[in-house]
Curated annotation (Swiss-Prot):
First-level EC class: lyase
Gene Ontology biological process terms from the UniProt entry: L-histidine biosynthetic process
The protein's name in its UniProt record: Imidazole glycerol phosphate synthase subunit HisF
Keyword Amino-acid biosynthesis tagged: yes
Organism field: Escherichia coli (strain 55989 / EAEC)
Length: 258
């Protein structure tokens, strides 16, 4: 059995790490490189960096900090933000990133997933999916351009359909960003994760809602996700990664202990 992964997420805007609630009202957390180094030292399995306004601004991720991060950590990291071409991806990978993640650009041009997978291999192509639960219809819908709340829009895709579509096109991993839960720390949306797990045959990463160690356990045990991504509980030092992994190990979760 592959070890489950603990993945801190660093949302980047204007060269700094920020964090919002339900993708809105972002506050500045701190500088990118020191935070990345701290998480690596605490025992994170990998890191994810989202340049959250790159796609909505029509630009590619700011690459200036990617090489600096690569110099100070020795764990894999993934970079996302406005990657719309093979050239964009190649540059980011050349600066030291291990994976690239696409979200809004994949919705705009789904063939991008296949072209990236063919060029770089499925193992380093992650598709992020920003999913919103509509309480009136009882359905999950994919959102686009979520880094800028003034430009966020609901797409034609229902989440389960898009999960299946991106796999057909070559996604090697899926990060499910559950917008309703984002930043509120009341637990992952287990029901949605279970439904996605049924149709997701590549590694699935849960994102949005972690507030306690038990929330991570529930995602691994009840929804069988491969990794759990979180931000505010790590940024605000509510949960220490080393202590979290020790707890998960006592609960029978296969996890890498540093």
């Amino acid at each position: 059995m592959l070890a489950k992964r603990i993945i801190p997420c660093l949302d980047v805007r204007d060269g700094q790490v920020v964090k919002g609630v339900q993708f809105r009202n972002h506050e500045i957390i701190g500088d990118i490189v020191p935070l990345a180094k701290r998480y690596a030292e605490e025992g994170a399995d990998e890191l994810v960096f989202y340049d959250i306004t790159a796609s909505s601004d029509g630009r590619v991720v700011d690459k200036s900090w990617v090489s600096r991060v690569a110099e100070v950590i020795d764990i894999p990291f993934c970079v996302a933000g406005g990657i719309k071409s093979l050239e964009d991806a190649a540059k980011i990978l050349s600066f030291g990133a291990d994976k690239i993640s696409i979200n809004s650009p994949a919705l705009a041009d789904p063939t991008l997933i296949t072209r990236l997978a063919d060029r770089f291999g499925v193992q380093c192509i992650v598709v992020g999916i920003d999913t919103w639960y509509d309480g009136e219809t009882g359905k999950y819908h994919v959102n686009q351009y979520t880094g800028d709340e003034s430009r966020t829009r609901v797409t034609q895709w229902e989440t389960l359909d898009w999960v299946q579509e991106v796999q057909k096109r070559g996604a090697g991993e899926i990060v499910l960003n559950m917008m309703n839960q984002d930043g509120v720390r009341n637990g992952y949306d287990l029901e949605q994760l279970k439904k996605v797990r049924e149709v997701c045959h590549v590694p699935l990463i849960a994102s949005g809602g972690a507030g306690t160690m038990e929330h991570f356990l529930e995602a691994f045990r009840d929804a069988d996700v491969d990794g759990a991504l979180a931000a505010s509980v790590f940024h605000k030092q509510i949960i220490n990664i080393g202590e979290l992994k020790a707890y998960l190990a006592t609960q029978g979760v296969e996890i890498r202990i540093c």
